[in-house]
């Protein structure tokens, strides 16, 4: 089963959200011009934005779970055929 791309994006965004909040210093919430943001947090935010943009740019495969769904829909018919021909013979 394929995991949706949006789930990967959500995990990356949630995992890095702690470092993203460090980009604005909490000691000065009004944005003092002399206060420098953390360069590591800025780099992390840029990398996260780039990863999300790349993930959204890739085309999504059309119906990746279709073979699995087809198999699951045929299971009752297979069960009926096995019971009719092999078990109740």
UniProtKB/Swiss-Prot annotation:
Its main location: secreted. One of its GO terms (molecular function) is toxin activity. Residues 23-61 form a propeptide. It comes from the Eukaryota. Residues 1-22 form the signal peptide. Expressed by the venom gland. GO terms for cellular component: extracellular region. The modification Asparagine amide is found at residue 88. It is found in: Secreted. Keywords: Amidation, Ion channel impairing toxin, Neurotoxin, Secreted, Signal, Toxin, Voltage-gated sodium channel impairing toxin. Belongs to the formicidae venom clade 1 family. Toxin that potently modulates mammalian voltage-gated sodium (Nav) channels, reducing the voltage threshold for activation and inhibiting channel inactivation. Shows activity on hNav1.6/SCN8A (EC(50)=176 nM), mNav1.7/SCN9A (EC(50)=102 nM) and hNav1.7 (EC(50)=154 nM). In vivo, causes spontaneous, gradual and long-lasting nocifensive behaviors by intraplantar injection in mice, as well as pronounced swelling of the injected paw. Does not have effect on insects (blowflies). Negative results: shows low activity at hNav1.8/SCN10A (EC(50)=2.6 uM) and hNav1.9/SCN11A (EC(50)<1 uM). Does not exhibit hemolytic and cytotoxic activities on HEK293 cells. This is Myrmicitoxin(1)-Pm2a. The lineage of its organism: Eukaryota, Metazoa, Ecdysozoa, Arthropoda, Hexapoda.
């Amino acid at each position: 089963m394929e995991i949706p791309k949006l789930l990967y994006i959500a995990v990356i965004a949630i995992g890095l959200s702690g470092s993203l909040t460090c980009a604005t210093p909490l000691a000065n919430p009004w944005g003092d011009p002399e206060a420098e943001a953390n360069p590591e947090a800025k780099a992390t935010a840029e990398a996260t934005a780039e990863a999300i943009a790349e993930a959204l740019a890739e085309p999504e495969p059309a119906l990746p779970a279709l073979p699995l769904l087809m198999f699951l829909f045929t299971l009752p018919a297979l069960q009926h055929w096995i019971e009719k021909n092999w078990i109740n013979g």
